[in-house]
Amino acid sequence: MANTQLQLSPTNTNSRQKFTVSFWLKRGKINSEQCVWTTRLDSGNNTLFKFNANDTFTFKCNKSNADALVLTSNALFRDASGWYNVVIAVDTTQSTDTNRVKIYINGVQETSFGTATYPSQNLSLEINESGNQVWYIGSESSQNYFDGSMSYFAFVSETQEAPTVFGSTDSTTGEWQIKTSITPSVAFGTNGFLILKDGSSLTDQSSNSNNFSL
């Protein structure tokens, strides 16, 4: 997807406190800053997930040019031959700060962070809002493009889901494998979507018709 980005402008506003993002990716290049996705109003108001130049990842939210959420992993992600399933499950209404954002890599929750700034309770993140906000998949709004492949990119817009909604452990090999049928605990939500189900289709498979464009 180098130098390619997918775009969607939400037409509805759903919960900005509860949502889940899941995607499968294979890195085509390491040791470079690459944004996997961002939701962006402007440079000072956005939410994004990216790989850093040292191959850690960062999930962050900027509000009014200030960091409202920053989680940067200690773990390094340098495997360019295998697939990673990343699940980011958010519920800022939780009383315990570490329960407000949970990040899973291949079904295992990441708990070791070099930087860990959790959102304040009940914070509304910069996501899931109609108007001028835009989803970008594969870039940070026309910069820091992701180099690699993606598949089964899903957004559940109103609930914090478990990673088992999107994948399962193979009973023989112990490997985390994709679930080709995704059923959220409640529903995808009005702004929810599932694209790249076949690795290339931008047509939403969730029945919401939230189709992306190049």
What are these regions (language model features)?
Residues 26-32, 42-43, 63-65, 91-95, ...:
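Acidic glycine-/aspartate-rich tracts in secreted/extracellular proteins
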Residues 1-18, 68-78, 140-142, 178-186:
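Short surface loop/edge beta-strand patches of beta-sandwich-type extracellular domains
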Residues 23, 81-92, 103:
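Short tryptophan-centered beta-strand motifs in secreted/extracellular beta-sheet-rich domains
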Residues 1-4, 95-97, 111-118, 149-214:
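Extended recognition patches within non-cytosolic domains
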Residues 7-9, 38-40, 48-52, 58-62, ...:
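Beta-strand-rich, repetitive solenoid scaffolds
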Residues 3-60, 94-97, 161-164:
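Extracellular glycan-recognition modules
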Residues 125-150:
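Extracellular glycan-interaction patches encoded by glycine-rich segments
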